[in-house]
Swiss-Prot record:
Compartments (UniProt record): Cytoplasm
Family from the record: Belongs to the diaminopimelate epimerase family.
Catalysed reactions, as listed in the record: (2S,6S)-2,6-diaminopimelate = meso-2,6-diaminopimelate
Superkingdom, taxonomy of origin: Bacteria
Main location: cytoplasm
InterPro entries registered for this protein in UniProt: DAP_epimerase_AS (IPR018510), DAP_epimerase_DapF (IPR001653)
PROSITE patterns: DAP_EPIMERASE
Family matches, as Gene3D superfamilies: Diaminopimelate Epimerase, Chain A, domain 1
Pathway: Amino-acid biosynthesis; L-lysine biosynthesis via DAP pathway; DL-2,6-diaminopimelate from LL-2,6-diaminopimelate: step 1/1
MF (Gene Ontology): diaminopimelate epimerase activity
Species of provenance: Mycolicibacterium vanbaalenii (strain DSM 7251 / JCM 13017 / BCRC 16820 / KCTC 9966 / NRRL B-24157 / PYR-1) (Mycobacterium vanbaalenii)
Active site as annotated: C87, C226
Subunit structure of this chain's protein: Homodimer.
Protein name (Swiss-Prot/TrEMBL): Diaminopimelate epimerase
Length: 289
């Protein structure tokens, strides 16, 4: 079984080309594949298929709103095997893989997801790297909330980027203090407000057009980056300074991206790197069930 490995600002993924969408991506198999000791290791799995094939194979009962059968479809699974609606870093790596593998010849096309269609632009391809912009859709503010991260309570802005986020700006926190925060520890949040869980971002206040951010992703834990999280962080940071639109550089442990928020849309631009291609042992995969 063929696979590829890639990352977007060190948010890493195993890509499984499966154009007929007939692989059994059970939670146990996905979790084993993402395990950094017994599997390949990753923050998530990206099945590479089309929307029509995914629907025909029963991956979903009906096409997500705005997605058509001919669109590419990113079937994304978290490291614990759960299904996720959207992954901004994953879309960049997914689009890069399509172009680099020859499955796609265009530099502009649409990637479907459970959160809907995500138009992409490959700005540059160079060796194993790419610079990709993703149209992420409108980021909707859903009020305020609070979460406990690393034993500290933070107030934040709830933001829907196709998946739920609580982005917490701490104006008193320095980048050094943020780096010392135990983001890997389990987070505590209002389950009534976020019944399906939530991704929690903690970030510094904007300075010179940039913020620093760390993230605890639902179903994964702390990751080096989270694409949708950087969009949510940009929305919260702009709101913190009294703005609804603008562009910010978001610095995460895995690198940096540029997020642009408009009245009707949001855009995520950043790198993708494809680091490996190979074959999974069929016997190992079959044993994961």
């Amino acid at each position: 079984m063929k696979f590829a490995k890639g990352h977007g600002t060190q948010n890493d993924f195993v890509l499984l080309p499966d154009l007929t969408a007939d692989l059994a991506l059970t939670p146990a198999a996905v979790a084993a594949l993402c395990d950094r000791r017994q599997g390949l290791g990753a923050d998530g799995v990206l099945r590479v298929t089309t929307a029509g094939a995914a629907r025909a194979a029963g991956v979903f009962d009906r096409l997500p709103e705005g997605v058509v059968e001919g669109d590419w479809y990113m079937d994304y699974r978290n490291a614990d095997g759960s299904i996720a609606q959207m992954c901004g870093n994953g879309v960049r790596v997914f689009a890069h893989y399509l172009r680099a593998s020859g499955l796609e010849s265009r530099d502009e096309f649409v990637v479907g997801s459970l959160a809907g269609p995500r138009p992409v632009v490959l700005n540059a391809l160079a060796g194993v790297g790419a610079d990709v912009t993703v149209e992420m859709g409108k980021a909707n503010q859903l009020g305020v909330g609070a979460a406990t991260v690393g034993g500290r309570q933070f107030n934040g802005l709830a933001v829907d980027v196709g998946n739920p986020h609580l982005a917490c700006v701490d104006a008193a926190m320095s980048s050094r203090e943020l780096a010392a925060l135990d983001v890997a520890a389990p987070v505590v949040f209002d389950a009534a407000q976020f019944p399906d869980g939530v991704n929690v971002e903690v970030l510094t206040a904007p300075e010179d057009g940039a913020v620093s951010m760390r993230v605890h992703e639902r179903g994964v834990g702390e990751t080096r980056s989270c694409g949708t999280g950087t969009v949510a962080a940009a929305v919260a940071a702009l709101a913190h300074q009294g703005s609804q639109t603008g562009s910010l550089t978001v610095r995460i442990p895995g690198g940096e991206v540029v997020v642009t928020i408009t009245d009707a849309n949001s855009y995520l631009r950043g790198p993708s790197v494809l680091v490996a291609h190979g074959d999974l042992a069929d016997e190992w995969w079959a044993a994961q069930g």
